[in-house]
């Protein structure tokens, strides 16, 4: 099993709290490789916290929210390298836990080989779209929430997914993020 983790982080001062290192300590046990993408500042304390788990730390302008942080990591690897992984986990610093070892979840989900992608939680959608401004739909579809999404290798190899990420427009707001990514 070869699994890449992409961890998105934002905190206005760039400081990493203990709940994040607690999460990463367990997550990292299930990864072959980890890249951390920080939008904005990363303090010396924050860098030291992440360096416990990886030297692959990208600090970038705070632009494009989580979507463009993930895109930055994907672009840094390129599709040829990304397709070498059995799974790619995209997650962020809005999760707390785990309460139980993540290995249990990863093992259970790996048994279901019919999945091209999966996530930790879903939003159940709405008949009308609660977001103002740009809309792709007049309703809010049921969707996997962006704080934890896993892509399987065959999905990463799909030209449709590669095209989706290669042509992802700049994300300007939370609404854009939900509408175009989740």
Positions of the model-derived regions?
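Short acidic, S/G/P-rich loop/turn micro-motifs used as interaction or catalytic elements
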Residues: 10-15, 41-42, 95-98, 125, ...
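Well-ordered, non-membrane alpha-helical segments in soluble/globular domains
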Residues: 17-24, 102-106, 176-182
């Amino acid at each position: 099993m070869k699994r890449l983790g992409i961890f998105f982080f934002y905190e206005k001062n760039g400081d990493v709290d203990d709940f994040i290192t607690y999460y990463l300590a367990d997550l990292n046990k299930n990864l072959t490789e980890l890249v951390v993408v920080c939008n904005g500042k990363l303090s010396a304390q924050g860098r030291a916290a992440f360096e416990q788990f990886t030297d692959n730390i990208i600090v970038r302008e705070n632009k494009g929210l989580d979507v463009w942080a993930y895109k930055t990591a994907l672009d840094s690897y390129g599709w040829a390298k990304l397709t070498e992984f059995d799974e790619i986990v995209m997650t962020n610093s809005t999760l707390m836990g785990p309460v139980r070892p993540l290995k249990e979840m990863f093992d259970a989900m790996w048994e279901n080989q019919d999945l091209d992608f999966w996530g930790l939680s879903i939003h159940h959608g709405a008949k009308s779209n609660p977001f103002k401004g740009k809309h792709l739909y007049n309703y809010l579809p049921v969707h996997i929430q962006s704080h934890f999404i896993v892509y399987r290798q065959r999905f990463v190899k799909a030209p449709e997914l590669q095209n989706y990420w290669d042509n992802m427009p700049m994300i300007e707001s939370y609404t854009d993020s939900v509408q175009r990514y989740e």
